[in-house]
Regions:
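Divalent metal-coordination and catalytic microenvironments
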Residues: 36, 51, 56, 78, ...
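C-terminal cap of metal-dependent C-N hydrolases
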Residues: 36-39, 47, 372, 384, ...
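Polyanionic/metal-chelating signatures
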Residues: 131-268
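His/Asp/Glu-enriched, well-ordered alpha-helical/loop segment
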Residues: 27, 98, 102-106, 111-113, ...
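Sec-dependent N-terminal signal peptides
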Residues: 3-13
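Active-site core of metal-dependent hydrolases
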Residues: 48, 213-316, 333, 372-374, ...
Length: 410
């Protein structure tokens, strides 16, 4: 992986309006990739096919398409081409400008109006790591808070480019550390705070409606952009992503979603297999990390006593989590989030496949499933005319651990 060549062909390169003065120093606007094994979508492929790209969009795909006269042709010599993968969870910092607003919620941890795309605080190293795995697009979430704000979508260029400003509201159950006197200071307090904020939002929107209908009989309502943003997100059935650390947090997320009629998504913990029956009614969309627990060190005598039966059982079952969720009929995507070593990502994908989940399902969890959930199914996740030319070129099959990524196109 370290020796693989990463090529970024941004649509920004195609947007220049100045006259071309030296052809050899200007990137071509039209490309044709020939002689490739093209994985157009999970389960579908074209052997010996070609892809024509114009201005950052796929113009044609097929086995017998003609190379446009103005195209720069590249012979891929049988390399495999996949639609660019979608990283379902990437975090960025808080937009500090939003903290200056006088119309915000009294608690700085409640910022549903905050948008992740307004503060692209992402290290270049992190972007390069994701591209080295084949990711070309990311679902970007705010990093801090209880009501963290709105996620968005970016292309993983050297200078990330937002392509959708608002996807979902993000909720975290994390409470403030002990020793701090600010509310909330316990899990019980966080849950109460989340519920009260939803009730406050309901009250705020209803009060606005009453004032609009009877302005002469009521005092004007103080503007609160936080409660308004939260209410509007619910009104348009925007997804609410709950960050979980085990199966009990997932249950809490489902309970809150049922109480307030939310469209729930769950950033998983890897323990979902323990409560499959609990998700059957609401059918949330799962964003699943694959940072499996490391092998317990039980070589030395008595060292096995430091591990509980539950820990040993989870170590054994964790790679099966996606298999169980798929068999239960749940939709999910895969994320590299939480992985300390991104180089383990493809190895862990192979573990999932070895445990029985098909390559097509795994590929769909990296492409078509997140694209559909994010509302980008007409431009991302497939290799087809009209789609963004976000591509991953591999010298063999992606799920073959010996294969190397040759280039990434964005």
């Amino acid at each position: 992986m370290k020796n693989s060549l990463i090529i970024i062909l941004s649509t920004l390169l195609f947007s220049q309006t100045e006259p071309i003065e030296n052809l050899r120093e200007n990137s071509p606007r039209v490309w044709t990739l020939t002689n490739a094994m093209i994985h157009t979508s999970p389960g579908n492929f074209i052997k010996g096919g070609s892809i024509s790209i114009r201005n950052g969009k796929i113009e044609a795909v097929g086995r017998y398409i003609k190379t446009p006269k103005d195209a720069f042709e590249i012979n891929l010599n049988g390399a495999h081409v996949y639609a660019g993968f979608i990283e379902s969870w990437l975090e960025t910092g808080l937009n500090k400008e939003s903290l200056k607003s006088t119309r915000k919620h009294w608690d700085s941890k409640v910022r549903p109006e905050n948008r992740s795309v307004d503060n692209l605080d992402i290290k270049n190293k992190a972007i390069k790591e994701l591209r080295s795995l084949g990711f070309t697009t990311a679902h970007l979430a705010p990093k801090h808070g209880i009501f963290r704000g709105q996620s968005g979508i970016i292309n993983l260029q050297n200078e990330p480019k937002p392509i959708k400003s608002s996807v979902a509201q993000i909720i975290d159950f994390k409470y403030r550390e002990k020793g701090k006197r600010t509310y909330p200071r316990s899990l019980l307090g966080v849950i109460a705070h989340i519920r009260q904020t939803f009730y406050d939002s309901d009250w705020y929107l209803k009060a606005q409606e009453i004032y609009a209908a009877y302005p002469s009989e009521n005092e004007p309502l103080a503007s609160n952009i936080s409660l308004e943003s939260l209410g509007m997100s619910r009104a348009v059935n925007k997804p609410f992503v709950f960050i979980t650390t085990d199966e009990t947090y997932s249950q809490r997320a489902i309970n809150i979603s049922s109480e307030f009629d939310l469209n729930p998504w769950i950033l998983g913990s890897g323990y979902e297999y323990r409560r499959l029956d609990y998700f059957s009614k609401t059918k949330p969309f799962f964003i699943l990390p694959i940072d499996f627990p490391s092998k317990p060190n039980v070589v030395k005598p008595m060292s096995d006593l430091q591990y509980s039966t539950a820990e040993l059982k989870h170590w054994d079952i964790a790679p099966d989590n996606l298999f169980y969720l798929n068999n239960a009929g749940h939709d999910f995507s895969i994320t590299s989030h939480y992985m300390k070593k991104k180089s383990e990502f493809r190895k862990n994908l192979q573990k999932i496949i070895d445990r029985g989940l098909s390559e097509d399902i795994v590929l769909s969890a990296l492409t078509t499933q997140p694209a559909e959930a994010l509302g980008m199914q007409k431009s991302l996740g497939k290799i087809a005319p009209g789609y963004d030319a976000n591509l991953v070129v591999v010298d063999g099959e992606y799920f073959d651990p010996k294969s190397k990524i040759v280039s990434v196109w964005i």
